[in-house]
């Protein structure tokens, strides 16, 4: 047994200059796992609670000392002597200790940091990489794949101080032979886009996730400049590279309408879905995330009906990595893919359950970072260890994003042909 002999929590900083929670789990054999909780900007209302102190005299109320105290107090006491390899048992102990539906007593940030740190420590004690341990926990030992990256090269919405309403415009290097080549393609397009924006006299400042954040005349113009950048980088749009959007539509849903303030347009629910479909008819958009508000289930049914057979429709705020909500979506034929964010649900065990449920229902699962990140690269191992097939971890800029890409490079080097890169086949509706 990999017995836990100590659990330590601390307050560290995330990529936006806000505090977050880091945890260490120490085992009897001298193994130490360490992990940090990320934090989102555009958040679903049903996400597990990120516990903040609310003390305006520290970090504008965003301190996490209470969450840290929970780790160093009741969580540590409950986990001492337990087997770190028994992930489901550890997570259930913390869930029961919290006793609330959304982890608002101990904080999902506290529980998640310990959950991931325990997994890392257990992997070390077994002498195997984290991705291999995750595959075993997932019930799929030895089954791996390298994910297709969704690279967020233009930021808007809550991730940038510009007039672009849609939050993320992403490129997917689906024509690459392997992950290393995909990463190179994305980097070259990113640098090409910088030159295109500069030539138009547009800003090349970056947003929270490392993508450029220029002011543009419309959301369609963002797609147009990306098309130019892809072509000037020497690639063919629609063959080598496809496009993906994260609308984060909940952020501009007001009084039953979708208000694109940046371009002065207001749509009803079906009208906004039709607008997105028109963009997908003009450009090779193969994935759209949160194309409607999290509560607009009737609208989601329409969007799935008109686009779900050809385009991957990803539920982020819609499903919040929650199996109960995902079950409802599957039963009602809502969307066809789920975004997976550890901290929306608050433990590794519950995260793996959501991925398995999605796959069993024929949905895809897209592993994702948050806009507030750290150097922690666990999501890279999660993507490979569950053979999820797709990952969102920002642009080729900002060390908090690049850390995940670099970890994926290391993993691909280790696994070689055991972790194939399947490109377009990984995306719902494209196989």
Swiss-Prot record:
Protein name: Enolase
SMART domains given in the database record: Enolase_C (SM01192), Enolase_N (SM01193)
Organism in which the protein naturally occurs: Shewanella denitrificans (strain OS217 / ATCC BAA-1090 / DSM 15013)
Gene name as annotated: eno
One biological process term in Gene Ontology: glycolytic process
Catalytic EC class: lyase
Principal location class: cytoplasm
Subunit structure and binding partners: Component of the RNA degradosome, a multiprotein complex involved in RNA processing and mRNA degradation.
Active site: 209, 341
PROSITE patterns reported for this sequence: ENOLASE
Pfam families: Enolase_C (PF00113), Enolase_N (PF03952)
UniProt binding sites for Mg(2+): 246, 289, 316
């Amino acid at each position: 047994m990999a017995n836990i002999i100590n659990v330590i929590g601390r307050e560290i900083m995330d990529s936006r200059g806000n505090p977050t929670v880091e945890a260490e789990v120490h085992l009897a054999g001298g193994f130490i796992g360490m992990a940090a909780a990320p934090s989102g900007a555009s958040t679903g209302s049903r996400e597990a609670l990120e516990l903040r102190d609310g003390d305006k005299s520290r970090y504008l109320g965003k301190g996490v000392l209470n969450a840290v105290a929970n780790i160093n107090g009741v969580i540590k006491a409950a986990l001492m002597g337990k087997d770190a390899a028994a992930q489901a048992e550890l997570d259930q102990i913390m869930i029961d200790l919290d006793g609330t539906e959304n982890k608002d007593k101990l904080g999902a940030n506290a529980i998640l940091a310990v959950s991931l740190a325990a997994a890392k420590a257990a992997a070390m004690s077994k002498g195997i990489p984290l991705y291999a341990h995750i595959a075993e926990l997932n019930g799929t030992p030895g089954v791996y794949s390298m994910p297709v990256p969704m690279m967020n090269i233009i930021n808007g919405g809550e991730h940038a101080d510009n007039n672009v309403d849609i939050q993320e415009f992403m490129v997917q290097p689906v024509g690459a032979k392997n992950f290393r080549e995909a990463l190179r393609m994305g980097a070259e397009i990113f640098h090409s886009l910088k030159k295109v924006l500069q030539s138009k006299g547009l800003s090349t400042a970056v947003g929270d996730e490392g993508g450029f954040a220029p002011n543009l005349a419309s959301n369609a113009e963002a797609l147009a400049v990306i098309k130019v950048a892809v072509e000037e980088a020497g690639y063919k749009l629609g063959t080598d590279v496809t496009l993906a959007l994260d609308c984060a539509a909940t952020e501009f849903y007001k009084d039953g309408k979708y208000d694109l303030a940046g371009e002065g347009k207001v749509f009803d629910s079906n009208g906004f879905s039709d607008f997105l479909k028109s963009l997908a008819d003009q450009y090779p958009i193969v994935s759209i995330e949160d194309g409607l508000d999290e509560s607009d289930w009737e609208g989601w049914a329409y969007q799935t009906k008109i686009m779900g057979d050809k385009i991957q429709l990803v539920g982020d705020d819609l499903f919040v990595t929650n199996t109960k909500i995902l079950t409802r979506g599957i039963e009602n034929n809502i969307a066809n893919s789920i975004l997976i964010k550890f901290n929306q649900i608050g433990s590794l065990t519950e995260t793996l359950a959501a991925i398995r449920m999605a796959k069993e229902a024929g949905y895809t699962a897209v592993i994702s970072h948050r806009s507030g990140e750290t150097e922690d690269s666990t999501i890279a191992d999660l993507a490979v260890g569950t053979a999820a097939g797709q990952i969102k971890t920002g642009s080729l800029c900002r060390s908090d994003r690049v850390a995940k890409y670099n970890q994926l490079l290391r993993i691909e080097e280790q696994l070689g042909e055991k972790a194939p890169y399947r490109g377009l086949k990984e995306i719902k509706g494209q196989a």
